[in-house]
Amino acid sequence: MKNKLIIGRYLPINSFVHHLDPRAKLMFVFLFIILIFFCHSPLTYLWVFALILFIMRLAKIQLWFLIKGLTPIFFFLIFTLMMHIFLTKGGYVLVEWHGITIETNGILEGLYISLRLIGIVMIATIMTLSTSPIDLTDAFERLLAPLKMFKLPVHQLSMIMSIALRFIPTLMDELDKIILAQKSRGSEISSGNIATRIKSFIPLLVPLFISAFQRAEELAVAMEVRGYDANVKRTSYRQLKWQLRDTISLTMIIPIAIILFVLKYSGV
């Protein structure tokens, strides 16, 4: 993979996580996101990331692959960390210079927020790498099926999510091709200061948007040719079957949740 965006891609591997019901994986990710917001200390984050590493091993995904997937949000993580360092007050004053103070609470809050974002991106990356877009769409539609009684277009929402997930890596691959084409013409995209780099990326947006609209039109024509109708009840060739291993896997998060709550209310 030439580009660094990993999330949204499917990695076909014969692993325990790959064979789990996609509904179980979606529910696990949802519960994990809720759980990680209860982390409040280094020890609680240690437990959460130990769980991520355990799931990563079950999915047979290498750690460097997940770390590579974090590179697109690297600058956002740095920005979040710096904002908390300079704006969040409390605790001991570490640095004081011309009215600017850096205090311990700011550093801790910045680190904790960054770790939460890293954990969420890593667990979501594992889910997309181990679940095909079709399975994700089916799982999303099945889980939201009760909302149909409120006249919500559940199937259409599921299809939008599936197409969006599929288009993310496709557009990133297209961006790679455009960048290589621009470099072959002598364009300096990766050099210069930040302002220069931003200006150099502007010419990339027009061909990228044109390519995106072309692919969207081709997809719409292909779906229409195959007789796709969003208003007709859809059947699935591959039926989802909830098994005992899915229940066991979903309950893996319970002991971690108990540990985090015990640590939180015991002041550790």
Swiss-Prot record:
The chain crosses the membrane at residues 28-48, 63-83, 107-127, 152-172, 248-268. One of its GO terms (cellular component) is plasma membrane. It comes from the Bacteria. It is a multi-pass membrane protein. Keywords: Cell membrane, Membrane, Transmembrane, Transmembrane helix, Transport. GO terms for molecular function: transmembrane transporter activity. Forms a stable energy-coupling factor (ECF) transporter complex composed of 2 membrane-embedded substrate-binding proteins (S component), 2 ATP-binding proteins (A component) and 2 transmembrane proteins (T component). May be able to interact with more than 1 S component at a time. This is Energy-coupling factor transporter transmembrane protein EcfT. It comes from Staphylococcus aureus (strain 04-02981).
